[in-house]
Amino acid sequence: MPLNVHPDIISLSPYVPGKPIEELQRELGLARIIKLASNENPLGPSMKARAALSQGAETLHRYPDGGAFRLREALADRWKVTPDQIILGNGSDEILGLLARTFLAPGDEAIMADQTFVIYKMEVTAAHGRPVIVPLKQWRHDLQAMAGAITDRTKLLFLCNPNNPTGTMVSASEVERLLLRVPAHTVVVFDEAYFEYVRSQQFPDSMAYVKQGRNVIVLRTFSKIYGLAGLRIGYGVTTAEITNFLNRVRPPFNVNSLAQRAALAALGDDEHVARSRAVNAAGMEQMVKGLAALGFAPIPSEANFVYVDIGRDGRQVFEAMLREGVIVRHIEGRMVRVTIGMEEENREFLAALKRVVHPALSAG
């Protein structure tokens, strides 16, 4: 008997993550692998977070705090909001799913860019909503076109800032103009996973929009600069009214106790965050200069990765780099995304890329 699967689910393709280090080691028998595919912090978690994990092992037989009281209190204090304005997720990805399930009825619309975080489209489709795709303009969100795409059925508008995979950002003045055109029935989702890496002074203060009581939610994560990707924990800051509805569809105990402990400790380690920013800034300069020396011009990035036109089939370059023991992320066509690593990792990546794209020069 055939399965009776909803057509929207049939239309989806499973998410394909960056290739795991262990998998490549098994396939090629390589001892050393450099992974620059998933925008992880090369420093890893702070020592405070590691210590918190060790201490948390003693209570693993107990269910976690379902309301994440201590972590929500700390986040509320950090962003000067109330704890009932904070929602925790098993990664910020989970909160994207909660938003889709909460706000989308079948056929309702959600606006997003064409080259942005793929999970938006997946979650909207899984909730039987309709993704409305607006092309990027010069690698950046076209906020004017996104505002023009809003209809009576638009319930969500996703703004990944800085954008993944391009690394580009939209400014405060651009966002202000967008918000003037957003009706009350549309919730704007500021997905700011890479917020802590931003250097531009023009970046919008999205938390201010929350405090103004607007229908917005700001998503942040502990997976990137805090180095806790393996624990899956992220959070949203919004109005108490919106969190109230999101909590109605949030699974119980969705954030495990180790993740809560580590995130709380990481949040209090500003020194580790500062060091991570410094490593990224130095690595970004090294990467941009190294790519330029090879004839490539990556798109200016405000995140912890670069997006670059590699000048040839990106899939072939990706596969050739795997054989060199380097994992990057092929996005589409000639475009490849590369995470900023430690100095030695960046140097080895650039040397491997030179061997792949300029073999004659490398041999010489």
Located regions from the model:
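N-terminal "arm"/small-domain region of PLP-dependent enzymes with the aminotransferase-like
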Residues: 1-62
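PLP-dependent aminotransferase class I/II
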Residues: 67, 215-299
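PLP-dependent aminotransferase-like
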Residues: 102-159
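Active-site pre-lysine segment of PLP-dependent enzymes
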Residues: 125, 143-153, 165-188, 192-223
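PLP-dependent enzyme catalytic core of the Aspartate aminotransferase-like
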Residues: 173, 319-364
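Conserved PLP-binding catalytic core of the aspartate aminotransferase-like
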Residues: 280-281, 289-324, 340
